[in-house]
């Protein structure tokens, strides 16, 4: 999508017959390392509104994303010779397994869709002596998101009640918020994008993002920024994009 944007910029710069207002273009490479568009100088960028080009299938148009948080949980065990362990050993690996088993199986990425949120354990390193788990928390709804964070806190308290204070240490951090509230006052951005897609022969499909986008961070920093499709598929896996989607007339 970056090369397509660059090519379009070249056309606009070289073909003076195409009338247009002021256009700003920025490439933000830091999303996948967790910084998003934090380093983008919005004042220097000089635009009132923007779009990210970070979506999926052709026609997708998005202005809602997950509220997101990350829970890092460290389990402290007690290692001792297994032949002399009765009443003494605390196996951090088994305690970590017990903690994970408290979470609802139906609220995982593989079993949710649309506006359904989830818990996703994406890291576990464990020995008898210690364990580290990382769980990401996602939900579009602010109240459900808050309830999910409280669930994680409760699960860790239950572990400490069972195995002693300090067994489970939780660090819970918010990552980003749903930009919906920042886009609703500027719905002309959505209507204009719909019309542009229709003019190009593309059927617009407004869907919630089951993830995040730099546009969420930018919207909360004062630059309302919905998300446009790239025509790509299977992100974070074996990516694919249709050649015909790259060559649509604009």
Functional labels for PLM-detected ranges:
Residues 1-66, 108, 112, 116-122, ...:
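Acidic/histidine-rich catalytic neighborhood of metal-dependent amide-processing enzymes
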Residues 1-29, 71-75, 81, 86-105, ...:
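Alpha-helical metal-binding/catalytic segments enriched in His/Glu/Asp
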Residues 3-7, 244-250:
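Conserved small/polar residues in nucleotide/adenosyl-binding loops
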Residues 23-24, 47-51, 71-72, 204-205, ...:
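Structural motif
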Residues 28, 54, 74-78, 138-140, ...:
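Solvent-exposed residues in well-ordered beta-strands and their adjoining turns
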Residues 57-60, 81, 234-236:
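Short gly/pro/ser/thr-enriched loop/turn and capping motifs at secondary-structure boundaries
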Residues 92-242, 246:
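Metal-dependent amide/peptide-bond hydrolase catalytic core
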């Amino acid at each position: 999508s970056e090369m397509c944007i660059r090519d379009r910029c070249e056309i606009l710069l070289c073909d003076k017959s195409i009338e247009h207002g002021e256009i700003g273009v920025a490439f933000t490479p830091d999303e996948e390392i967790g910084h998003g568009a934090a380093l983008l100088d919005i004042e220097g960028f000089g635009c009132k509104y923007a779009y990210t080009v970070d979506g999926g299938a052709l026609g997708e148009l998005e202005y809602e994303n997950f509220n997101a948080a990350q829970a890092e949980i460290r389990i402290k065990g007690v290692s001792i010779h297994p032949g002399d362990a009765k009443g003494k050993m605390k196996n951090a690996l088994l305690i970590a397994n017990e903690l994970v088993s408290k979470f609802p199986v139906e609220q995982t990425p593989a079993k949710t869709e649309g506006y359904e949120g989830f818990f996703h354990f994406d890291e576990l390193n464990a020995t008898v002596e210690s364990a580290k788990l990382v769980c990401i928390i996602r939900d579009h709804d602010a109240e459900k998101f808050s309830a999910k964070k409280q669930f994680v806190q409760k699960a860790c308290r239950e572990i400490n009640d069972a195995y002693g204070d300090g067994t489970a240490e939780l660090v819970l951090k918010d990552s980003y918020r749903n930009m919906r509230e920042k886009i609703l006052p500027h719905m002309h951005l959505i209507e204009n994008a719909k019309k542009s897609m229709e003019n190009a022969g593309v059927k617009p499909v407004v869907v919630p993002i089951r993830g995040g986008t730099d546009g969420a961070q930018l919207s909360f920093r004062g630059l309302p920024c919905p998300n446009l499709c790239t025509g790509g598929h299977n992100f974070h896996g074996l990516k694919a994009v249709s050649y015909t989607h790259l060559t649509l007339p604009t």
